[in-house]
């Protein structure tokens, strides 16, 4: 199937009598309720369920193996190839399926808040609530922009169309396929709305580096003096909590680009976790869930329609989608200058990493490539032990290119703009999980504040004898003994053994990066 034929098929779909284009938020909410796709909550948000797929389905994600990208993609378990033949046949079937629908919903908008680098996109949805979701998550065009909008990438989403693995070359009924040549994302068999968000992020992670822009899975905020901070970290490290600062304005909570102009948000909204959400813990998120917001897999009281954020009956991965302007303390448009400070967050359950360390350029590249944190594996008896987990560049499921490409760009930009990089451990202190305790949040906030205001630049440091990290000896508001992890352990020999064990896990994980420079390995990693 040629690109021309693909465009003809799209044109027919978009010009069919069933296509509802660029409906407003109230119109979409009406459609959701009329079509029985979701419920209205007590705060005016729409609540919808995603069925059996309550999270991303990485084994069902494919990139079409086309001549123009075949030698650029880092093929493997993350970037699984699928043939053009399989894609073309499935695409044709999905289009025929959607043509028969009574209604389709189309959103036109952008990815990328910097007008110089934004990607015009359109999303064709089988579900009205999915269209409301993308309306809130991506960047909404003005009426004037809409008149000249020409989409460069299209998502076609048909959750109720199920693939046949034997015929379609998929691994299950669900599929998320990206064709860079035809500029199409094809999604079916899954109702999880996050697939649309992350597909565009994966595309931007391919397109932006081609323009010498580093795409990043991080949150970002800016201080009153215009100083920009980035927060990288996997789930459970405190990225959302620590980047929400009343004295700093939010640029974005999840996806950013770093160009020669500075930092920009890729999105126009937030997709926040809301398990155990409360007004006391996270007032910004709680208050943003109003009319037009979308709740995913949150249990709602049948009578009062009040959301129960503590109920994880459907999944722990409950989510809320809302536009950036639903939060008070933000920058709009979501662009800012070059980062002054970069924070890598890790929740080290082995309790051996320092609570804060200063990183050299090589160490920053090493820890960026490593993307380390811990996850806790539970047993039926409730006995838990920490497991090291590594997610390259703090976002491996979304990186189509070789990881070293992103790391090299980070190193270049750190050097060019003199950004200060810190590794912050929000995990355990005084022993590993089960012996020690979680790092005091007040101490972590004080350490990050000291990093942001430049105090750590002039603080005396000591080199960690196993990880080679420069550890500050004094941080205002933090007891000195907390800063050196070994001092918080009663059993010093046990600390050393555990630290060497983690250092070896770092080294073992790093063996997969065969294309990185020797400097990153020799100057960036553990020294023992």
From Swiss-Prot:
Its main location: cytoplasm. Coiled coil: none annotated. GO terms for molecular function: ATP binding; metal ion binding; phosphoenolpyruvate carboxykinase (ATP) activity. Binds 1 Mn(2+) ion per subunit. It is found in: Cytoplasm. SUPFAM superfamilies: PEP carboxykinase N-terminal domain, PEP carboxykinase-like. Transmembrane segments: none annotated. Its cofactor is Mn(2+). It catalyses: oxaloacetate + ATP = phosphoenolpyruvate + ADP + CO2. GO terms for biological process: gluconeogenesis. Mn(2+) binds at residues 198, 217, 254. It comes from the Bacteria. CDD domains: PEPCK_ATP (cd00484). Substrate binds at residues 56, 192, 198, 319. ATP binds at residues 198, 217, 233-241, 282, 319, 444. Pathway: Carbohydrate biosynthesis; gluconeogenesis. Keywords: ATP-binding, Cytoplasm, Decarboxylase, Gluconeogenesis, Lyase, Manganese, Metal-binding, Nucleotide-binding. GO terms for cellular component: cytosol. Its EC number is 4.1.1.49. PANTHER family: PHOSPHOENOLPYRUVATE CARBOXYKINASE (ATP) (PTHR30031:SF0), PHOSPHOENOLPYRUVATE CARBOXYKINASE ATP (PTHR30031). Belongs to the phosphoenolpyruvate carboxykinase (ATP) family. Involved in the gluconeogenesis. Catalyzes the conversion of oxaloacetate (OAA) to phosphoenolpyruvate (PEP) through direct phosphoryl transfer between the nucleoside triphosphate and OAA. This is Phosphoenolpyruvate carboxykinase (ATP). It comes from Bacillus cereus (strain ATCC 14579 / DSM 31 / CCUG 7414 / JCM 2152 / NBRC 15305 / NCIMB 9373 / NCTC 2599 / NRRL B-3711). The gene is pckA.
């Amino acid at each position: 199937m040629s690109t021309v034929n693909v465009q003809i098929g799209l044109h027919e779909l978009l010009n069919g009598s069933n296509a509802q284009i660029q409906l407003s938020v109230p119109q979409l909410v009406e459609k959701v309720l009329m079509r029985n796709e979701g419920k209205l909550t007590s705060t005016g948000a729409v609540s919808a369920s995603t069925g059996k797929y309550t999270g991303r389905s990485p084994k069902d994600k494919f990139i079409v193996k086309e001549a123009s990208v075949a030698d650029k993609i880092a093929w493997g378990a993350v970037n699984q190839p699928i043939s053009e033949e399989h894609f073309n046949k499935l695409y044709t079937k999905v289009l025929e399926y959607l043509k028969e629908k009574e209604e389709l919903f189309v959103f036109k908008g952008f990815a990328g808040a910097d007008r110089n680098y934004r990607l015009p996109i359109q999303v064709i949805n089988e579900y009205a609530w999915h269209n409301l979701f993308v309306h809130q998550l991506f960047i909404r065009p003005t009426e004037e922009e809409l008149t000249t909008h020409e989409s460069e990438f299209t998502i076609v989403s048909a959750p109720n169309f199920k693939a046949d693995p034997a015929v379609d070359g998929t691994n299950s009924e669900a599929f998320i396929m990206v064709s860079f040549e035809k500029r199409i994302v094809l999604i079916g068999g899954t109702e999880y709305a996050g697939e649309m968000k992350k597909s565009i992020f994966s595309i931007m992670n391919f397109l932006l580096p081609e323009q010498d822009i580093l795409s990043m899975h991080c949150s970002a905020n800016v201080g009153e003096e215009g100083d920009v901070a980035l927060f990288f970290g996997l789930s459970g490290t405190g990225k959302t909590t620590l980047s929400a600062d009343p004295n700093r304005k939010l640029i974005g909570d999840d996806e950013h680009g770093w160009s020669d102009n500075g930092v920009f948000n890729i999105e126009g909204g937030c997709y926040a976790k809301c398990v155990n959400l409360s007004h006391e813990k996270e007032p910004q998120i709680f208050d943003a869930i109003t009319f037009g917001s979308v709740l995913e897999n949150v249990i709602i009281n049948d009578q009062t329609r009040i959301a129960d954020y503590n109920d994880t009956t459907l999944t722990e991965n409950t989510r809320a989608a809302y536009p950036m302007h639903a939060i008070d303390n933000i920058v709009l448009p979501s662009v800012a200058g070059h980062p002054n400070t970069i924070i890598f967050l890790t929740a080290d359950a082995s309790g051996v990493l320092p609570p804060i360390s200063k990183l050299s350029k090589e160490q920053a590249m090493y820890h960026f490539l490593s993307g380390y944190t811990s996850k806790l594996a539970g047993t039926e008896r409730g006995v838990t032990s920490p497991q090291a987990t590594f997610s390259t560049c703090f976002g491996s499921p979304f990186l189509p290119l070789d990881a070293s490409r992103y790391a090299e760009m980070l190193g270049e930009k750190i050097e060019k703009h003199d950004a200060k990089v810190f590794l912050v451990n929000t995990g355990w202190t005084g022993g590993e999980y089960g012996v020690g305790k979680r790092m005091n949040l007040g101490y972590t906030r004080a350490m990050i504040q000291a990093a942001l205001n430049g105090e750590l630049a002039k603080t005396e440091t000591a080199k960690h004898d196993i990880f080679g990290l420069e550890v500050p000896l004094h941080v205002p508001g933090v007891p000195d003994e907390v800063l050196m992890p070994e001092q918080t352990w009663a059993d010093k020999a046990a600390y050393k053994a555990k630290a060497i064990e983690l250092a070896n896990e770092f080294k073992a994980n790093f063996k997969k990066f065969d294309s990185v420079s020797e400097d990153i390995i020799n100057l960036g990693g553990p020294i023992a």
